[in-house]
């Protein structure tokens, strides 16, 4: 699977390590200030984007992923006041989004 990582902190590094160990490839890393990379062919080639950022940037990241045609998994918390907006955005895109607030078990099972 080709994965784009959005947010390259502790969780991003952990996901990358496990993904590579399992034979997946990381097509791009996007960290704070590098959001324009979501407009690149490398990003659009991803099978999925895995996003761990901040509440202030998460919804815009979701929008950019969906606009690029990339389904996403997010572990970012603190944006639920905008849940209806995000649900509509995902439904309108025809793509998928998976969100959970606790990846401690998820990372172990990845």
Residue ranges and their predicted role:
Residues 39, 47-67, 78-83:
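Beta-loop-alpha module in the N-terminal Rossmann-like domain of NAD(P)-dependent dehydrogenases
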Residues 32-35, 77-80, 103:
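Short, acidic/turn-prone active-site loops that include or flank metal/cofactor-
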Residues 63, 76-100, 108-110:
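Rossmann-fold NAD(P)-binding glycine/threonine-rich loop
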Residues 2-15:
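Glycine-rich adenosine-cofactor-binding loop
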Residues 14, 18-39:
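NAD(P)-binding Rossmann-fold cofactor-contacting core
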Residues 68-71, 93-95:
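A short helix->loop->beta-strand "cap" motif at the edges of active sites that frequently abuts
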């Amino acid at each position: 699977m080709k994965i784009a990582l959005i947010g390259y902190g502790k969780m991003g590094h952990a996901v990358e390590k496990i993904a590579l160990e399992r034979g997946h490839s990381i097509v791009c890393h996007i960290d704070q200030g590098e959001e324009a990379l979501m407009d690149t062919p490398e990003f659009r080639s991803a099978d999925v984007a895995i996003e761990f950022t901040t509440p202030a940037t998460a919804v815009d990241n979701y929008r950019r992923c969906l606009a690029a045609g990339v389904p996403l998994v997010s572990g970012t918390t603190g944006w639920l006041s905008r849940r209806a907006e995000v649900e509509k955005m995902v439904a309108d895109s025809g793509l998928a989004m998976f969100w959970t607030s606790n990846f401690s078990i998820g990372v172990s099972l990845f």
